[in-house]
Regions:
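Catalytic cores of nucleic-acid ligases and guanylyltransferases
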Residues: 1-314
Length: 314
């Protein structure tokens, strides 16, 4: 099956805005997925090219049932907790690699498509976004677990207030006349209701009291080629997460800290900086540390070397 470049990514926005030349979509709290079909060959891949198909057999079946048999579409795989997309709930499917076991999890998943990169042998990436979204809507039947990502035109500030009031993660603003570029671009902008950050896990502290497996994660981000320490995270774990993540950490242990020179916790244990987590937090301190961080889940779709501190763009 032919490959395409990595997916287009959004930059972090400083504040919501309204503009008739932009469209605004709901920011879904899931994992990015590229859906491909060439004849009978159907696949889902992550933004790093990892095969996601075994974890989501019902999505593969739904894509195979579409009349269209030649496409590349961009979207997000999500699970719901009530009316909210839940990255935490999706964790129960992300790490299951056997299709039979994936079905037994009883966690329904959905694929929300928002862009069409190729259709019927034609490359659409140079077309304006509005034209691509129009083609996407016509190309798929959007029944069952495959769904269309709706958008609003122009009134971004009002839509953002509504999104935050509903408990959504935020919005993605997209320039309506923009082409699809396989990079991070200011033509797509993330507008977040809360604050989240992807961070590299590079160590942990021993458990205390009744806690088992580990106490807190030691996390950081890359800056100027070095791994910068961003603090420790001791909340957001249930018993199962502590056990599963603890086993992963033990397998990655190394003797020396991978962080650049910093004031690091005593008695810490270090791991190869390969695992990437998603974390919620209240703010950054002046010295580049997280305030009130909480673990949301592991990200298997992000290389550790690409993790940098997200800074709002004006």
């Amino acid at each position: 099956m032919a490959k395409t470049g990595e997916p287009m990514k959004a930059k972090l926005g400083a504040a919501p805005f309204s503009d008739p030349d932009w469209v605004f979509e709901r920011k879904l709290d899931g994992i990015r997925a590229i859906a491909r079909r060439e004849g009978d060959a159907v696949s889902l891949t992550s933004r790093t090219g990892k095969n996601l198909s075994p974890s989501y057999p019902e999505l593969i079946e739904a894509l195979a049932a579409e009349p269209a048999d030649d496409f590349v579409a961009d979207g997000e795989i999500v699970a719901f907790d009530g009316s909210q997309t839940s990255f935490a709930k999706l964790q129960g499917r992300m790490h299951v690699k056997d299709p039979r076991l994936a079905r037994l999890t009883a966690i329904p998943v959905f694929l929300y498509l928002f862009d069409l990169l190729r259709f019927d042998g034609h490359d659409l990436t140079e077309l304006p976004l509005r034209a691509r979204k129009g083609a996407l809507r016509r190309a798929f039947s959007f029944h069952g677990p495959v769904r269309y990502t709706a958008h609003r035109n122009e009134h971004g500030e009002r839509f953002f207030r509504e999104a935050c009031d509903k408990g959504w993660e935020g919005l993605i603003a997209k320039r309506a006349d923009s082409a699809y570029s396989h990079t991070r671009s200011g033509n797509w902008v993330k507008l977040k209701c809360g604050r989240e950050q992807e961070l590299v896990i590079a160590g942990f502290t021993p458990p205390q009291g009744s806690r088992q497996h580990f106490g807190a994660l030691l996390v950081g981000f890359y800056e100027d080629g070095e791994l910068r320490y961003a603090g420790k995270v001791g909340t957001g774990f249930d018993h199962r997460t502590l056990a599963e993540l603890g086993a992963k950490l033990e397998a990655l242990e190394i003797p020396e800290p991978p962080f650049a020179a910093a004031d690091l916790p005593r008695l810490a244990r270090w791991v190869r900086p390969e695992l990437v987590g998603q974390f919620a937090f209240s703010e950054w301190t002046r010295d580049g540390k997280l305030r009130h961080p909480s673990f949301l889940g592991l990200r298997e779709d992000k290389p550790a070397q690409e993790v940098v501190r997200e800074r709002p763009e004006a």
